[in-house]
């Protein structure tokens, strides 16, 4: 879907005095949609945590999700505020933030779907600059990680609530005609961002970002067995190591430049640091001018 369509679907302004509001377009509209998503996500996670009285781990995960969404909202620059906090007399305020799904499985799927929505936009150099892609991509990947953590705690699949999430999306679309903004996930049913790493394209060979990512994946793969021994908490280290080596081979066969070294060292071997290093290498590809490289980075990031 084109950015024009996406921007038009970001939110509908109230019919009364709508023309008095400044017009959002381009990345400004996309950014505000992402910010509204985080605001809705934080509010719903807080509400769900308050009622999760029979599951302490669930409540804790939900509060963490709410805190993460709030942090991402701030990193995105907050909600659009054209009037500086006080709406002038006779002028219209931006539409209220629509609510996120109330059912946990639908909420988790909604988090994941809105994340891939934003990641697809970030992966398209025709829609986002390098800096815009980094900003939007960071929010999208953080939201996807929140969805994955909640799915793990609740023991459900990310896609378990897809149908319910789409139903909520349809209801919000209908309400948007009355001045409520839409989540637009229905526009991204056929996402170009794949959770399967299969890069292709003529730009891969010249991409310094992909080459650096390959080196990072390879170094992490060779360090994981040692990390498992030293940390004692990485039970899947060997499996992840094998998957990373397969990814390295896939990238090299697709044309990535090989800058691996026979010896490499990582500053930290704990799970959080290793994961952070991987995601940083993946996300760096979103700053590329090549759609092929950005798509490779987005796919790798979803996997990691």
What are these regions (language model features)?
Residues 1-8:
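Sec-dependent N-terminal signal peptides
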Residues 17-304:
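All-alpha RGS (Regulator of G-protein Signaling) helical domain and cognate RGS-like helical scaffolds
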Residues 11-15:
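C-terminal motif of bacterial Sec signal peptides marking the signal peptidase cleavage site
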């Amino acid at each position: 879907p084109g950015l024009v369509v996406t921007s038009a679907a970001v939110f509908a302004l109230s019919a009364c005095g709508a023309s008095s509001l400044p017009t959002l377009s381009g990345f400004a509209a996309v950014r505000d949609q992402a910010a509204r998503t985080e605001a809705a996500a934080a509010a719903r996670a807080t509400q769900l945590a308050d009622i999760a009285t029979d599951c302490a781990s669930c409540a804790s995960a939900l509060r963490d999700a709410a805190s993460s969404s709030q942090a991402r909202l701030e990193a995105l620059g907050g909600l659009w505020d054209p009037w500086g906090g006080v709406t002038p007399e006779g002028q219209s305020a931006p539409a209220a933030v629509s609510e996120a799904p109330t059912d946990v499985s639908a909420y988790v799927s909604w988090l994941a779907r809105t994340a891939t929505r934003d990641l697809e936009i970030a992966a398209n150099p025709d829609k986002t600059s390098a800096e815009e892609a980094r900003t939007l991509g960071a929010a999208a990947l953080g939201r996807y990680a929140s969805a994955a953590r909640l799915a793990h705690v609740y023991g459900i699949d990310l896609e378990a609530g897809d149908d319910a999430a789409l139903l909520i999306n349809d209801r919000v679309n209908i309400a948007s005609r009355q001045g409520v903004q839409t989540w637009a996930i229905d526009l991204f049913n056929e996402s170009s961002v794949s959770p399967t790493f299969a890069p292709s394209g003529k730009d891969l060979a010249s991409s310094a970002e992909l080459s650096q990512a390959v080196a990072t994946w390879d170094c992490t793969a060779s360090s994981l067995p040692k990390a498992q021994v030293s940390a004692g908490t990485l039970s899947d280290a060997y499996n992840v190591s094998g998957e990373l080596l397969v990814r390295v081979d896939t990238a090299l066969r697709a044309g990535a430049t090989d800058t691996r070294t026979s010896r490499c060292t990582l500053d930290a071997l704990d799970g959080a640091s290793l994961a952070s290093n991987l995601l940083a290498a993946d996300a760096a590809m979103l700053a590329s001018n090549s759609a092929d490289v950005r798509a490779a980075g987005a796919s790798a990031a979803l996997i990691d």
